[in-house]
Amino acid sequence: PLSVMMALEMARTGADGDTKQQMGAVLYPGMSAEDGSMVLGRICKSLPDAEGARFHMSDSVWVKTADDVFVPDENFLDTVKTAYDAEVFGAPFDETTCRDINRLVEQETDGMITEILDQIPELAVMYLVNAVAFDAEWETPYDESQIQDATFYAEDGSGQEVSMMYDTTYRYLTMEHAEGFCRAYKEGYDFVALLPEEGLSLSEWLEELDGETFHETIRQENDTMIET
């Protein structure tokens, strides 16, 4: 995910020696870390920002200032500010900092994520925080008659009453051990839902899924009518 990629890239920027080299090799296989970082930067700058589809990303660095236990390298701070437009905050790393980080994430994700921390460990001295939000309108909006209450079942078998959206689509997806569908957002983006076959846990399915298989599945959508 892009959010994880950005957080790890900021961490790589602050690393040195073998650690920095190894992180670059993992993040950017087949290319130099410098080239990979440039590609990542171009991807971030090309994210949609239109009326019908908006992708917002925010980076921040939080540094513990209490007791002067940790002094970050100024070159690192300058780099994350200029290269990633990151905000840098000095904070006491107490309950107020926990609240401030959660508030910033909630703000930057349009309220979709309200909490990422419930407490800050005593030994923590820095947080690299990346918040991502994608907000888009359906190309064909649902009307009220297509929204009904039903039971959603979690992987552990527990059920919860939620509002569900119903539709008929012709964009059916199938792959080994899973099936699903696509539904269009505005500005050329798609919502993709995939459901592992019964008896296969989500973690087991994700362990065998790779990027090439996923993209091939999307490219070969079937023109088959299904109810979603």
Question: How would you label these PLM feature ranges?
Answer:
Residues 1-23, 107, 111:
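Flexible propeptides and autoinhibitory/regulatory segments associated with cysteine proteases
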Residues 8-9, 24, 44, 129:
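Short, well-ordered alpha-helical packing segments
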Residues 10, 14-17, 26-30, 46, ...:
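Generic N-terminal helix/loop capping motif
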Residues 23-27, 142-149, 203-212:
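Short Gly/aromatic-enriched secondary-structure transition segments
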Residues 28-34, 38:
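Active-site helix/loop module of the DD-peptidase/beta-lactamase fold
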Residues 36-199, 215-228:
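Non-catalytic, conformational "gating/processing" segments within enzyme and secreted inhibitor domains
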